[in-house]
Amino acid sequence: NMSGNLVTSIQSSLVLAYGVRKEIKSGDAEAWKIQSEIMPISGASLDPQGEINTEWELKLNDDCPITDKSASLFLLFGGDKVMEEGGRIDLRVELHPILQSFLQTFTTQFKFLEKHRKSKEDHTEVKLVPPESKEFPNLEQILCMLKIHEEQLESVFQFKMKGFSRDGENMKVVKKKREFEIQMTPEEYLLPGDFPNRQLFREKISEALDIARQRVF
């Protein structure tokens, strides 16, 4: 309190909220999707030249949205109108470490190239393109939907493929989409010491990639 007067009924709010950058510019509170909120200080009084210190904690969920070019999690802080007039901190949220390790298996073991990473409604979408090799002649790209929900690792692969299909005695070029789903429990994807089970990741991903290794479909 930098003034010479007593200040009463002090309220401090902290809100963890998700916002699309072009939408939150309007200042409309409805543009935010609240994840969690706390009120570290409520109804306090502050003497002239005094200050209040308080501890607080906001935890991110395992399946919280990551930061990308269009949207992010923000920490909003202020008083009664924190959503409209409060300050904000743009949080740089990365992919969950276990999901990051799972994803790295594509790039390190199978030489896929990551093209983009986006936060969707309840998962992270990653676009992967295959290496130039004879192993995946029909594969154009993979959309990988990743999340950890209630401690379970869930991944859905959407394969975009092209190849040859039999039409009687003839062969024709066709394009198709295939899907493969992987689910793992913490007992499966974690080793003692909470290290990621990279060997299992390789096995699961290799099983999924068998779809793309088929030359005729």
Predicted regions located by residue number:
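Well-ordered beta-strand positions in beta-sheet-rich domains
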Residues: I38-G43, E85-D90, E179-E181
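Beta-strand elements of well-folded, non-transmembrane domains
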Residues: N1-M2, L14-V20, L60-D62, F77-K81, ...
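A surface-exposed loop-and-adjacent beta-strand signature within N-terminal beta-sandwich domains
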Residues: M2-L58, P186, L200
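Short glycine/proline/serine/threonine-rich loop/turn segments at secondary-structure transition edges
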Residues: D62-F74
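C-terminal interaction module
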Residues: R117-V216
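Localized sequence-composition bias
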Residues: L103-H123
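Short beta-strand elements
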Residues: V82-T105
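Intrinsic-disorder/low-complexity, polar/charged segments enriched in Ser/Thr/Lys/Arg/Asp/Glu/Gln
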Residues: E51-E55, G86-R88, Q141
